Amino acid sequence: LGGACVAGILGPLSDRLGRKKVLLSGVAFFVITCLLILLTHNIESFLVLRFLQGFGLSVIAAVGYAAIQETFEERDAIKVMALMANISLLAPLIGPVVGAFLIDHVSWHWGFIAIAFLAFLSWFGLKAKMPARTSSIPKKPLSYIWDDYMQVLKNKTFMGMTLGLPMVAMPLMLWIALSPVMLVEELGLSSMQYGLAQFPVLGGLILGNIVLIKVIDRLPLGKTVLIGLPLMLLGTAIVVVGIIWREYFLHCVILGMTLVSFGEGISFSVLYRFALMSSEVSKGTVAAAVSVLMMFTFFFVIELIRILYEHFHLWAYALSCFALIALWFTIPRGLLKTIMQQRKVNGEF
């Protein structure tokens, strides 16, 4: 939610000041908030600083992704995003195991110290290696920001493809949000067993991204999505089967979510590229619009399903995942097929 509040400003700001300056400022702000959270003594101040951390974190979605799409050629940009996804997955993959160890043996403070240190190192990496923008964008009055956003939001292809992104990403987000409750409280797994259960699920996403990198040059752009989404639908159906036969739920949910994460791995970066390139407006503004829509959707849908989970428990999770993927097969799938047909007519692979 914190990231969504400022992402809309960061994109247009990076169009005017340059991607590098805004990224460096965002990373520095994130490091500072990670260190300040060590001084908190109650849950209220802790949550305020977590909210502020979202400000710095949002520069990746609102500015960093736009910089990647502009710097690299089409398929290379998709490969870079897939590679970034694999690197960022180390946090939720290793985090539960390391976090359980820190809480049991040391203190939660060390987790934020480590995060601040790694972010501090990334600041120097960006400073040294990120290319500065050489082409200048004409500076328009600030009133044009609103006009640009209106142009983006009135683009039906953009809206359809962008709103399809949370449908694809949400089941895994729900897994990350609710798996501690499902596995530890509902099924009685230990903290270590819970951490180990994340490996096949998030490992599926890593494998999917690797497969995408390997095959993206051989298939028409978008083909991996048409392969990945049916796999995701199958995965969510397996989770529903696990709810019906409760004694097999643990095996079904891990198998099903592994298929879901693999399908997301071979699909999401391609869908993001199509969403970002569906508008002719400056990519900082478009990326910011994508980021804001996705973050608010994540926030509200996760909260809605959390409330449903309190009443319907595992059924709420399983049916929500299935419904989200099934929804993608409506308008977003039709738009994807249209884009692929248009690319074929234009002689684009």
Regions found by a protein language model. Give the residues of each.
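Juxtamembrane intracellular "pre-TM" segments in multi-pass secondary transporters
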Residues: P131-T162
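Helix-loop-helix hairpin linking two adjacent transmembrane segments in secondary transporters
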Residues: S45, A82-K127
